[in-house]
Amino acid sequence: MRMTSNLYFYKIHSEVKDPVRATEGSACFDLHASLPQFSAVKVYENNFEEVDKRDRKVVDGRVQVNPNERILIPTGLIFDIPVGHSVRLYPRSSLALKNGLTLANNIGIIDSYWIDF
């Protein structure tokens, strides 16, 4: 178990990257995608119906994102969030500007009771 600013987290495998601050003055931690070879990701079509996970395999640490799709990208982390608290996910402006990617709901909220592998 590791700790980051009083928030404990667990890695689901050894290759998962720790949350890091990009600079000493960064207000938040950066998270990285965890896309092991031969894994799959959940893909949602434009109408938010779930598509078979087997249809979108990870190849060479990459996953294809088609127009009007939403994809859950795993971090490989499990956060030990205290009851009554949450982890907030914010999109990086550079990710949207340079790659056209952002969070579907603009801010992601992970409640203390949420665990998904």
Where are these regions (language model features)?
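DUTPase catalytic domain/fold
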Residues: 1-117
